[in-house]
């Protein structure tokens, strides 16, 4: 297992493959809240697409610290845990990004789960600590 703040090629692959990420945030009472979600990586920043007002978005507005766990869906012994903080929340291109994630995870061109009046928001996460466990050969 290695610990670093640099995203290695192996961790990049985990983030770019069709693996679900489990994103943990802190509730108002400091209890953990965890959500399985789609994930993206752009220029060293991890991006989570959510809807404005959802629990994880409210939580990171109050406390930007997050933990992310990803397990390779092809090999459960290839895994990464990332601690970081949300450095930006933006609605800019969030709908377009949801479509990009739908293409990656579902193979469809348009995000199919949007609700009427829903406002998509991107959570941009700066990785601070990365723990990667590689499978043994």
Where are these regions (language model features)?
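Hydrophobic alpha-helical segments typical of transmembrane helices
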Residues: 7-10, 22, 56, 97
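A short beta-turn/loop motif at secondary-structure boundaries
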Residues: 29-31, 72-76, 115-117
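Short, surface-exposed beta-strand-loop junctions and turns on beta-sheet-rich folds
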Residues: 54-56, 75
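Short beta-strand segments
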Residues: 19-52, 66-70, 80
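Extreme N-terminal tail/first-helix region
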Residues: 1-20
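Charged, gly/pro-rich active-site loop segments
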Residues: 2-6, 78-137
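Solvent-exposed residues in well-ordered beta-strands and their adjoining turns
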Residues: 42, 51, 71, 87-89, ...
């Amino acid at each position: 297992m290695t610990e670093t703040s640099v995203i290695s090629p192996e961790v990049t692959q985990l983030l770019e493959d069709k693996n679900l990420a489990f994103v943990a945030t802190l509730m108002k009472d400091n209890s953990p809240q965890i959500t399985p979600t789609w994930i993206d990586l752009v220029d060293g920043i991890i991006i989570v697409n959510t809807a404005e007002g959802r629990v994880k978005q409210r939580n990171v507005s109050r406390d930007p610290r997050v933990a992310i766990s990803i397990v390779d869906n092809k090999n459960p012994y290839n895994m990464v845990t990332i601690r970081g903080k949300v450095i930006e929340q933006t609605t800019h291109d969030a709908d377009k990004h949801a479509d990009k994630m739908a293409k990656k995870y579902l193979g469809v061109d348009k995000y199919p789960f949007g609700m009427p009046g829903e406002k998509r928001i991107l959570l941009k996460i700066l990785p601070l600590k990365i723990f990667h466990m590689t499978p043994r050969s």
